Curated annotation (Swiss-Prot):
Highest taxon of the lineage: Eukaryota
Protein name per its UniProtKB record: Synaptonemal complex protein 1
Free-text note regarding domains: The molecule is in a coiled coil structure that is formed by 4 polypeptide chains. The N-terminal and C-terminal regions exhibit a prominent seven-residues periodicity.
Gene: SYCP1
Listed GO CC annotations: autosome; central element; chromosome; chromosome, centromeric region; male germ cell nucleus; synaptonemal complex; transverse filament
Location of the protein in the cell: Nucleus; Chromosome; Chromosome, Centromere
PANTHER family, per database record: SYNAPTONEMAL COMPLEX PROTEIN 1
InterPro entries, alphabetized: SYCP1
Impact upon substituting residue 721 to F: Enables C-terminal tetrameric self-assembly at pH 8.0
Pfam family, one: SCP-1
């Protein structure tokens, strides 16, 4: 082993803070082996353990410690160079002056260099291991970040598609809610139709309308709501049975109407017979009246004969009345006067007994006349009873005829006026009865007349009862009409809503509805003919059908009219009740008066029996009777006039009755015609029902097909949604697991980073200690520089030829266009992250004179591509250190991109060393200059390493693209 010759690296002073040029000397440009040996020796002997730092791919300094950033790594090179120069000068001077002193200095420096190399080997091994770990962790973090970004994009796409699916589900839910609402409406329509059928079962015309409405409703239900096929079939069957029942009921009603018509015809014939009988009876009554008049004339003649005797008796009666008045006064005053009057009465009785014998003969004749009158009265009573029975039968029949309300109300008013007149007459008659109480004959005639008036009153009562019954029937009719109106209005409103909702589905059925409306119009016309009183109502109903918007107003008007009618009816009822009460009161008064009159008559009879004894008094009474006979004849004339009036009234009543019978006959004929029309309509309705049944069958088949299709579609959608939900759940589970793993990895990496920071702090402290030692060595070297300036150039040239060549590692493709000196630390001195320019400072020239042979190191400007890459690198990576190996291109003088320093990560250099079967420690060992130059990296190997790295990056990019495409395809399949 030959001794290494002393060598020194002369570095000129730094021209600027931005660039340091490293250029080979022009004289020795062709001798490449010289520089190779020099580089090799410098690499083996002066690799510092503290001078290398890792740079990122974009050339960023990753050292996060600000203390290290302040360290200027180029002065370290100057220190080493100066120390080597001083060491070399010392050796040269030692040849001349003291070889022993120089050898000692050299040996010391050599030992220190060996110690530094050993410490460097250990620290570099540790740092390389840590940096390899850090780089692996960085790659993992970058891959995880890319995966997270891809997952985020995928999650956003999935979220968008999920939102679209949710909106579609919401739309489906809305459609389902709409169908449910329609189903509820259908159920309500079914319930309402059932209620209407129950209401209109008892009426023929309304049952037909309900029949047609139900058929229309069934067709609407089938076309509009396909999902309710089973319910529609059940309702159809039920309605079919109901229609059969209704048809049977209609036939039954037709038979009943025919029977009623026959019965009414028979009744009319009976009424005509009864009218003839009544006319005969009236003729008999008129004949009896004439006979009674003759008898009255005879009685008047007899009364004229007896008038003379009666005058005498009347005079005596006046005297007796005066005496009776005196007696009454005396009876009130004292009892003594009564006894005297009793004695006078006994005397008078004796005289009357003689006179009674003469008057008995006259009384017998009068009794015979009375018996004849009583017989006539009994005959009248029997006729009156028969007439009452006939009137009752007529009342029952007239109750059935419900169309005479207005006429009867007018008659009621007339009869009420007649009743008032009759009440006045009764009052007059009561006065006359009080006047006729005094005489028995007069009272008998008045009783007869009162009986006749009672009969008339009873007839009026019968008419009142008939009118009351008719009023009740009319009230029922009005109530039924009100119910019908309300039902029709509700039905019209309901059907108008249904028509608005189902216009699109019921275009084919509009023709049928128009036909039905025409039938309804015909029926309404028939109802007009049948019921003249309800003509206004039917016109309003037609207007309601034509103008649905005006229905409400017309209904309100009708309701007001009905209320007015009800009020009038209530008023009439109140008036009738009031009249009834008055009649009852008058009857009671008449009965009381009659009872009183009967009692008075009995008393008078007793008095007559007593007074028959008094002949003189009877003669006076006969005179008075003659006078009263003339008055009675006048009254009889008055009564005859009244009887004539009553006969005229009877004739008018007969005429009215005839008119009523004619109207009934006309109504019966109209009803027959309407029944024929209705039968024709029933046949048409049957034909329409058969057609509807056929349509229902066809619609049922269509409903089944559509329902099957809808069920299949819904099942497909359900399966697809279930699959989508399962896949999304699995993806979410995977994402959660990946996130947990990443969080755990981040935590571990943070722990490792904290440990590395602690180690770096310890390394910084050691560096500071070594710097202090080197400063001491510099001071010692400066003292020796003054004596060795002249000999320095020659010795350095000879030494440079002998020194081995060393390669600095170069990887131009890891970070292009950046040059860094070997074992120098790249530190970013306060410059921004977007403008990371790495400044290389040249060593200060410690010598007084510049050296002719020197290297210039230039740092180029950053290209645009590097700036773009710097933006994407995270902040944490910019603060981490990274060691780099440098290699110079010695064959060039310029500072072009090929001459500039390039950086290669320590991790890749280690890989190349392992591939070349060179352990990492061999790169760090100390070698003598006599050994063969073994360059660790060649230009071909560096190109291979760059190509391999590119291939790996391309593979990773292709794999990432394939994964993205697969994920996108899977996400698209979920929503197809």
């Amino acid at each position: 082993m030959e001794k290494q010759k002393p060598f020194a690296l002369f570095v000129p002073p730094r021209s600027s803070s931005s660039q340091v040029s490293a250029v080979k000397p022009q004289t020795l440009g062709g001798d490449s082996t010289f520089f190779k040996s020099f580089n090799k020796c410098t690499e083996d002997d002066f690799e510092f353990p503290f001078a290398k730092t890792n740079l990122s791919k974009n050339g960023e300094n990753i050292d996060s410690d600000p203390a290290l950033q302040k360290v200027n790594f180029l002065p370290v090179l100057e220190q080493v160079g100066n120390s080597d120069c001083h060491y070399q000068e010392g050796l040269k001077d030692s040849d001349l002056e003291n070889s022993e002193g120089l050898s000692r200095v050299y040996s010391k420096l050599y030992k220190e260099a060996e110690k530094i190399k050993k410490w460097k080997v250990s620290t570099e091994a540790e740092l390389r291991q840590k940096e390899s770990k850090l780089q692996e962790n960085r790659k993992i973090i970058e891959a995880q970040r890319k995966a997270i970004q891809e997952l985020q994009f995928g999650n956003e796409k999935v979220s968008l598609k999920l939102e679209e699916g949710i909106q579609e589900n919401k739309d489906l839910i809305k459609e389902n809610n709409a169908t449910r609402h329609l189903c509820n409406l259908l159920k309500e329509t079914c319930a309402r139709s059932a209620e209407k059928t129950k209401k209109y079962e008892y009426e023929r015309e309304e049952t037909r309308q309900v029949y047609m409405d139900l058929n229309n409703n069934i067709e609407k239900m089938i076309t509009a709501f396909e999902e309710l096929r089973v319910q529609a079939e059940n309702s159809r069957l039920e309605m079919h049975f109901k229609l059969k029942e209704d048809y049977e009921k209609i036939q039954h009603l037709e038979q009943e109407y025919k029977k009623e018509i026959n019965d009414k015809e028979k009744q009319v014939s009976l009424l005509l017979i009864q009218i003839t009988e009544k006319e005969n009876k009236m003729k008999d009554l008129t004949f009896l009246l004439e006979e009674s008049r003759d008898k009255v004339n005879q009685l008047e003649e007899k009364t004229k004969l007896q008038s003379e005797n009666l005058k005498q008796s009347i005079e005596k009666q006046h005297h007796l009345t005066k005496e009776l008045e005196d007696i009454k006064v005396s009876l009130q005053r004292s009892v003594s006067t009564q006894k005297a009057l009793e004695e006078d009465l006994q005397i008078a009785t004796k005289t009357i007994c003689q006179l009674t014998e003469e008057k008995e003969t006259q009384m017998e004749e009068s009794n015979k006349a009375r018996a004849a009158h009583s017989f006539v009265v009994t005959e009248f009573e029997t006729t009156v009873c028969s007439l009452e029975e006939l009137l009752r039968t007529e009342q029952q029949r007239l109750e059935k005829n419900e169309d005479q309300l207005k006429i009867l109300t007018m008659e009621l008013q007339k009869k009420s006026s007649e009743l008032e007149e009759m009440t006045k007459l009764t009052n007059n008659k009561e006065v006359e009865l009080e006047e006729l109480k005094k005489v028995l004959g007069e009272k008998e005639t008045l009783l007869y007349e009162n009986k006749q008036f009672e009969k008339i009153a009873e007839e009026l009562k019968g008419t009142e009862q008939e009118l009351i019954g008719l009023l009740q029937a009319r009230e029922k009719e009005v109530h039924d009409l009100e119910i019908q109106l309300t039902a029709i209005t509700t039905s019209e409103q309901y059907y108008s809503k249904e028509v608005k909702d189902l216009k699109t589905e019921l275009e084919n059925e509009k023709l049928k509805n128009t036909e039905l409306t025409s039938h309804c119009n015909k029926l309404s016309l028939e109802n007009k003919e049948l019921t003249q009183e309800t003509s206004d109502m039917t016109l309003e109903l037609k207007n309601q059908q034509e103008d649905i918007n005006n229905n409400k107003k017309q209904e309100e008007r009708m309701l007001k009219q009905i209320e007015n009618l009800q009020e009038t009816e209530t008023q009439l009822r109140n008036e009738l009740e009031y009249v009834r009460e008055e009649l009852k009161q008058k009857r009671d008064e008449v009965k009381c008066k009659l009872d009183k009159s009967e009692e008075n008559c009995n008393n008078l009879r007793k008095q007559v029996e007593n007074k028959n004894k008094y002949i003189e008094e009877l003669q006076q009474e006969n005179k008075a009777l003659k006078k009263k006979g003339t008055a009675e004849s006048k009254q009889l004339n008055v009564y005859e006039i009244k009887v004539n009036k009553l006969e005229l009234e009877l004739e008018s009543a007969k005429q009215k009755f005839g008119e009523i019978t004619d109207t009934y006959q006309k109504e019966i004929e109209d009803k027959k015609i309407s029944e024929e029309n209705l039968l024709e309509e029933v046949e048409k309705a049957k034909v329409i029902a058969d057609e509807a049944v056929k349509l229902q069958k066809e619609i049922d088949k269509r409903c089944q097909h559509k329902i099957a299709e809808m069920v299949a579609l819904m099942e497909k959608h359900k399966h697809q949604y279930d699959k989508i939900i399962e896949e999304r759940d699995s993806e979410l589970g995977l994402y959660k697991s990946k996130e947990q793993e990443q969080s755990s990895l981040r935590a571990s990496l943070e722990i490792e980073l904290s440990n590395l920071k602690a180690e770096l702090l310890s390394v910084k402290k050691q560096l500071e200690i070594e710097r202090e030692e080197k400063e001491k060595l510099k001071r010692e070297a400066k003292e020796n520089t003054a004596t060795l300036k002249e000999k320095k150039d020659k010795k350095t040239q000879t030494f440079l030829l002998e020194t081995p060549e060393i390669y600095w590692k170069l990887d131009s493709k890891a970070v292009p266009s950046q040059t860094v000196s070997r074992n120098f630390t790249s530190v970013d001195h306060g410059i921004s992250k977007d403008k990371r320019d790495y400044l290389w400072t040249s060593a200060k020239n410690t010598l007084s004179t510049p050296l002719p042979k020197a290297y210039t190191v230039k740092t180029p400007t950053k290209p645009k591509l590097q700036q773009r890459e710097n933006l994407n690198i995270p902040i944490e990576e910019s603060k981490k250190k990274r060691k780099m190996a440098f290699e110079f291109d010695i064959n060039s003088d310029s500072s072009e991109t090929t001459d500039l320093l390039s950086m290669v990560s320590e991790e890749e250099t280690l890989k190349t060393l392992y591939r070349n079967n060179n352990p990492p420690a061999s790169h760090l060992c100390v070698k003598t200059p006599k050994k063969a130059p073994s360059s660790l990296t060649t230009p071909g190997s560096t190109l291979k390493f760059g190509a391999i790295r590119k291939m790996r990056e391309d593979r990773w990019a292709v794999i990432a693209k394939m994964d993205r495409k697969k994920k996108l395809k899977e996400a698209e399949k979920l929503f197809v």
